[in-house]
Amino acid sequence: MAVARTGVLGVQWLQRASWNMMPLGARTASHMTKDMFPGPYPRTPEERAAAAKKYNMRVEDYEPYPDDGMGYGDYPKLPDRSQHERDPWYSWDQPDLRLNWGEPMHWHLDMFNRNRVDTSPIPVSWNVMCMQLFGFLAFMIFMCWVGEVYPVYQPVGPKQYPYNNLYLERGGDPSKEPERVVHYEI
């Protein structure tokens, strides 16, 4: 415990001592450049063409988010499709996100990446899935009801006891000879 405490104190001292001499690498590399921020909303066709060129898009395909004060600026409005729908066999520059270098990312990429929402079409429609689910549940409830109404037990024979069918233990007269009981073996 003391060694761990000493190590933590040593690292903290080193960070405080070296703070004025050199900045942390993660801090200097994590800032966003002015090119990464969306520009103002394009009002003229020239501004629209410049914004399309900025995002590596054709002017016909470029459509910005509406200027409703949410701060989207000139960022392109891309279709709401998840990364699952993109070709998994294509040679992407970033295969985990299925993106190429310079390609604009969706504004809500954190929602549409591959471990979140999947917007790809489902092979079976919702009404068919619901019919299958509720049909299975109804069948199982029906079978449970049938099992309650008509119980099934293993067939058994009459109970057999040793020592002349426990004649004395079951209140038999000790002065009389009990009747002979034949036990059958199965």
UniProtKB/Swiss-Prot annotation:
Residues 1-28 form a transit peptide. InterPro entries: NDUFB8 (IPR008699), Ndufb8_metazoa (IPR016551). The chain crosses the membrane at residues 133-153. GO terms for biological process: mitochondrial electron transport, NADH to ubiquinone. The keyword 4Fe-4S does not apply. GO terms for cellular component: mitochondrial inner membrane; respiratory chain complex I. Coiled coil: none annotated. It is a single-pass membrane protein. The keyword Transit peptide applies. It is found in: Mitochondrion inner membrane. Pfam families: NDUF_B8. Keywords: Electron transport, Membrane, Mitochondrion, Mitochondrion inner membrane, Respiratory chain, Transit peptide, Transmembrane, Transmembrane helix, Transport. Accessory subunit of the mitochondrial membrane respiratory chain NADH dehydrogenase (Complex I), that is believed not to be involved in catalysis. Complex I functions in the transfer of electrons from NADH to the respiratory chain. The immediate electron acceptor for the enzyme is believed to be ubiquinone. Belongs to the complex I NDUFB8 subunit family. Complex I is composed of 45 different subunits. PANTHER family: NADH DEHYDROGENASE [UBIQUINONE] 1 BETA SUBCOMPLEX SUBUNIT 8, MITOCHONDRIAL, NADH-UBIQUINONE OXIDOREDUCTASE ASHI SUBUNIT. This is NADH dehydrogenase [ubiquinone] 1 beta subcomplex subunit 8, mitochondrial. The lineage of its organism: Eukaryota, Metazoa, Chordata, Craniata, Vertebrata.
